[in-house]
A protein has these predicted regions:
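Inhibitory N-terminal propeptides of secreted protease zymogens
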Residues: 1-71
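N-terminal domain-start motif of subtilase-like serine proteases
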Residues: 29-32, 41-51, 70-123, 160-175, ...
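Subtilisin-like serine protease catalytic core
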Residues: 92-214, 228-231, 259-260, 275-277, ...
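Structured lumen-facing ectodomains of secretory-pathway proteins
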Residues: 116-126, 135-148, 167, 264-265, ...
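Hydrolase catalytic cores
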Residues: 180-183, 201-207, 231, 376, ...
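Short acidic, glycine-rich surface-loop motifs adjacent to enzyme active sites
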Residues: 222-245, 268-269, 368-377
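C-terminal subdomain of the subtilisin-like protease fold in secreted/lumenal serine endopeptidases
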Residues: 234, 307, 412, 418-436, ...
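Catalytic-core regions built around general acid/base machinery
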Residues: 247-265
Length: 578
């Protein structure tokens, strides 16, 4: 029956394409879809949209949407501890559930496939021969391309750049590599993902120089993910306040087909705080005549997708310098070691330089020393930027700048010009440095420590609020996303924050649950389509509701069911199912 349906669908697509060719419309077929959608993408004049819709056999036509990567909100502290926070260390260490024989499709900006953290996997689901067999029997986007071109390694049996139409998936930014590390890095003591033994289908939908991704490429990736038998899909991309116009019905059907194929679809909820954030009220609260908080992003708003909110990590592993015996942790914005504070290494005097305006350096000897600067201030009637402070410090002869916050709060990132090493510390540490009798600090690349603060284990303030515009409860569940340490291109490691980091925790968790259900529940003969539903129900039923600093539960519109708890999901004796 399936082959007959596939044949009929192909004939219908051919009939419509022939109708286009006979028309006066200037239409070029770009991609065909056959698993999540019976259709194709075309390049055509906008003025022909209605005529395309009225073509016999066409159910719908719409202008494709543009999705942005859900960018990290701050690149603050180097972190560990997110996997233990969701019980991943217990299910891996005590039960042996590490995502064996599972595969996760990562629809993102690509991957550094040569990174040491993606070198090995135990009990892989797919070999190159398996991928070749699927390609021979399914119409993948790669067409007649040799499978050896998309098979990168045992860990990465399939990788393709849908945006640039080539096999180079490493040309994008660091976003996709960081996301993949959270799902399933396996680099021993440096970084271990939630499912270290899962395989990756790397589906690059962001062009090397593009700021976002288009439906054309996302649909191709989803279509292939279904054909390739993904157990879970991660999509850390979206648009705020998700709801679309003509595309809504069709895209809803697409995501429903992904779900009906037994694949868990995990999407970032978004980093847009709430609808009234920085709005007309002036206090980040909604007006009485417009009480809507919801700004959770699409595609996480579709009912078939799981919308994932972000919690701040439990522990942060951060670089620090010494003020006497006091450890002062900091955030270094520089990506290259040569531009980081640790490039100085040794004992350095520092000078209090106020807010870092040019006038603040007058009469002060900072040559060969570090400038200590307070955040904020003005110069010539305009706010002082971090880059201006850095420039003034360099011009005065400083070898580095330490900028401290002017308000209490978590460490944030700052934009710098790379003129001299610049790091950011919190307000209390900056004030301690100002009042210290001995204004000398010790710097070393070996100074790495573990810290927690008042924000650890709390919901990330940036994590987008629900509900959706049609009042669905979104997000559904929470995972660590604030200050997550993971893989970066070039064999490096570093931290990012955002729901983009929370969603892959869930995709990795789904791979772990897939192994658990396959090994422990096979006697029940659960169909693949129902395995995903059982996995979702177990994780939702055992999630831990989170409380704020006052001991009050966060709203489900902020955290969904709560923090995923893998160790509870694989040991619970009961669960809820809707």
């Amino acid at each position: 029956a399936g082959k007959e349906i596939e044949k009929t669908n192909a004939e219908n697509r051919k009939r419509i394409k022939n109708s286009f060719m006979r028309s006066n419309m200037d239409i070029e077929i770009e991609r065909e879809y056959s698993s999540v959608l019976n259709g194709f993408s075309v390049e055509a004049n906008y003025g022909d949209l209605q005529a395309i819709k009225e073509t016999e056999g066409v159910k719908n036509a719409f202008v494709e949407s543009f999705y942005k990567k859900i960018e990290p909100v701050e690149n603050s502290m180097l972190t560990t501890g997110s996997v233990p926070a969701i019980g991943g260390d217990i299910v891996g260490g005590d039960f042996g559930y590490t995502g064996k024989s599972s595969v996760v499709a990562i629809i993102d900006s690509g991957l550094d496939a040569s990174h040491e953290a993606f070198a090995s996997v135990n009990n892989p689901k797919y070999t190159m021969e398996d991928i070749a067999e699927i390609a021979a029997n399914s119409k993948l986007t790669i067409g007649t391309l040799a499978v050896s071109a998309v098979y990168k390694s045992e860990k990465i049996p399939y990788a393709y750049d849908y945006a640039d139409v080539d096999t180079n998936v490493s040309g994008g930014d660091s976003h996709g590599t960081h996301v993949a590390g959270i799902v399933g890095a396996n680099s021993g003591g440096v970084v271990q993902g939630v499912a270290p033994d899962t395989q990756f289908l790397i589906m690059k939908v962001f062009g090397d120089s593009a700021a976002g991704a288009y439906d054309t490429d996302i649909l191709s990736a989803l279509d292939d993910a279904v054909k390739l038998g993904a157990d879970a899909i991660n999509m850390s991309l979206g648009t705020p306040g998700g709801f679309s116009e003509d595309s809504a019905k069709t895209m809803r059907e697409v995501y429903n087909r992904v779900e009906n194929a037994g694949i868990g679809l995990y999407c970032a909820a978004g980093n847009e705080y709430s609808a009234p954030y920085q709005g007309a009220s002036g206090n980040n609260l909604p007006l009485a005549d417009n009480p809507d908080y919801g700004i959770v992003g699409s595609p996480s708003t579709y009912s078939a997708a799981v919308s994932v909110a972000s919690m701040n990590n439990m522990k942060s592993t951060s670089p620090y310098f010494l003020l006497g015996e006091q450890q002062i942790r900091y955030n270094d914005a520089a990506e290259e070691k040569s531009g980081q504070l640790v490039s100085l290494s040794g004992s350095y005097a520092y000078v209090d330089c106020g807010e870092g305006a040019a006038a603040d350096f007058e009469g002060k000897d900072v040559k060969g020393k570090i400038a200590l600067i307070r955040r904020g201030g003005e110069e010539n009637g305009e706010p002082l930027s971090f880059m201006q402070k850095e420039e003034h410090a360099k011009n005065a002869g400083a070898v580095a700048a330490i900028i401290y916050d002017n308000v209490d709060g978590a460490l944030v990132s700052m934009a710098t010009g790379g003129l001299i090493p610049c790091v950011f510390i919190n307000k209390s540490d900056g004030e301690r440095m100002c009042s210290a009798a001995d204004k000398t600090v010790q710097i070393s690349e070996t100074f790495i420590g573990r810290f927690s603060d008042d924000y650890s284990g709390k919901m990330s303030d940036f994590s987008s609020w629900g509900t959706t515009q049609d009042l669905q409860i979104k997000p559904e569940i929470t995972a660590p996303g604030g200050d997550i340490y993971s893989t970066l291109p070039g064999g490096l490691y570093g931290s990012m924050s955002g729901t983009s980091m929370a969603s892959p925790h869930m995709a990795g968790a789904a791979a772990v649950m897939d192994q658990y259900i396959r090994e422990e529940q096979d006697g029940l003969n659960i169909p693949q389509t129902d395995k995903n539903k059982l996995s979702h129900a177990l994780m939702m039923s055992t999630a831990l509701p989170l409380k704020d600093e006052n001991g009050n539960l966060y709203s489900p519109r902020k955290q969904g069911a709560g923090l995923v708890q893998l160790d509870k999901a694989v040991t619970t004796g009961a669960y809820l199912l809707n």
